[in-house]
Amino acid sequence: MSDEQQFSLFDASSEPAASPKSAKKTAKSVEPIAVEFERSQIPVTAKMPIPPGTYSDMNDMSAHCGECHRCELGSTRTNAVVSRGNPNADILIIVEGPGENEDLQGKPFVGKSGQLLDKILESVKLTEDDIFVCNIVKCRPPGNRKPSKDEMEACRPYLMEQIRLVNPKIIILTGASSIDGLFQEKSLGITKIRGQWRDWNGIACMPIFHPSYLLRNQSRDQGSQKWLTWQDIQEVRRMFDELKAAEAL
């Protein structure tokens, strides 16, 4: 089966509807940064914390990520992979470690898995304006292996700042590493927890299969991984509409 046929499972019945531009949202308020905090040391050592409110926007944070050596991945990367999408989006998607294409281009999910993710979102008429994509770690693990616990912990403060700045209504977690990294726990495995809403600091989180896993599992039959993902993304759309309607009241 060709990649195009794989993607076609999630083809929308019509062209995706353009969503209105999101109104500028305000990042969550934070306490003042402690006097002893040294911002210049953030990219140098994981021992230096990144207090909430350190960065004013994504560009500010990206500059630090580009020179970061908080873990050993900083010495093997080509580019730090920080984000893509609308920084004021209502849906934040956390993916696993960057792959080769992402490392070369400096953007998350630009390979075949990213193309499939875009198709999945388009199938329920979610547009680029509705989403913001980031990685659980910002640098590619050698050989595309899963990021280690220490690597995720070193990079976690960047992720926390991204969540604060975007202030999403929904978080989609693709794959087990994304879940483990956000919740700081060893999950039961994506097959057991996908499709079930979880709460993280008041934000609704939906675990789904990683698109690369879907590309390796071709069946579209009822109960297959692709079929289950279709159920999950429809549930995300339902929750998205429900939260938007409540906001409009």
Task: Map each language-model feature to its residues.
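A polyanion-binding, active-site-adjacent surface
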Residues: 2-249
